[in-house]
Amino acid sequence: MATTKSTTPRRKAAQSAQERPAAQGAQFPLECPKPRQMHPSEAVVIVREISKDAVKLFVMPKPSAVRSILNETFGPLGWAERRYFADSRLWCAVGVFNPYMRDYCFKDAAALEGKHPGSPERWKEETSFVAAAELWGVGSDVMALPSIVLRADQVPIAGIQKPGRKPNDPPQVVGYKLASAPTVDKFLRNPDTGEIISVQFVDKEGRKATWEK
């Protein structure tokens, strides 16, 4: 008696794990675009302490310049920021978009402490943002600078006076200030590492002063 041949297709043998093509996965550590170095005009000079003999300066990136570099490096939609209070301090988190996570990866930093000019609230807002962006490499070359001390023979320091208690009393010196506020004129960098090893300052009168690491 004739037998009927089955028309049911045979299943293809399952591929082993070694035979299957490997899925394209993320390679760790993930590569991240490297921000460029900061220009001298993108830094701001802040007076921390001053006496008749010297002035202590703090050089930091301008927040507007940090935003520009973030846009250049990651794109306007490639980064984000958020703020919150913790431990009685204002914190800022700067996030960079991660295509594998399809979300932003955030790094957090608190506002810088110490003496500062102007509004305390603005100082906290700006320095927490700059410090968080530094964790992504933006402005890290400038933020790596230590406090810079310039002598009175390098920058003009003027006394702040107030009248004496009596009409015939000589004026009293109650503090000191820079006769002209300096700005950053030039950076000198290590050719191998890019580290800033010297800063040249200039004031409105064109007087220049140089600090070397």
Q: What spans do the regions from the language model cover?
A:
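N-terminal, Lys/Arg- and Ser/Thr-rich interaction peptides
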Residues: A2-K56
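Strand-helix-loop interaction patch of compact alpha/beta domains
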Residues: P33-D87
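Flexible, active-site-adjacent loop/turn segments at secondary-structure boundaries
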Residues: F28, F58, S140-M143
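Positively charged, aromatic-enriched nucleic acid-contacting surfaces
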Residues: S64-K213
